[in-house]
């Protein structure tokens, strides 16, 4: 499969009058090419006890280790579904696992943030409450809010700096190799 740079992805699919294709498209077209291994699960949405959109598992049958990544996409920001909000931010004492990373594509940046750091920020800024209705989403977290917290951090990657993106994925790939 042909590899595409982030700036090309943004030009063809994000900076358009058409509807943005969404996170599953972003995973398939751009993110999968960044990993040295094929994920064990894509977009499991909580099925089989897996959290996140991209999941790598240990090949050792006696190990339950996994590395999971939640992916979000949105021009100005993004929100979380009812289940994601309730399980990951409100009922944090549950035995369900949490993602290891958040990868978020916004208008101007790609954010690759360790989940714990992102989760702490989201809870601090949005003070999420349990969503009781059948449908509903969390409050939106905006690009500018992420920038204010991570302005000088390596979590925020300028779209034009593909080499910085590679450095972040090298780190994640090393973690995947250790599974």
What label would you give each PLM region?
Residues 1-179:
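Nucleic-acid endonuclease domains
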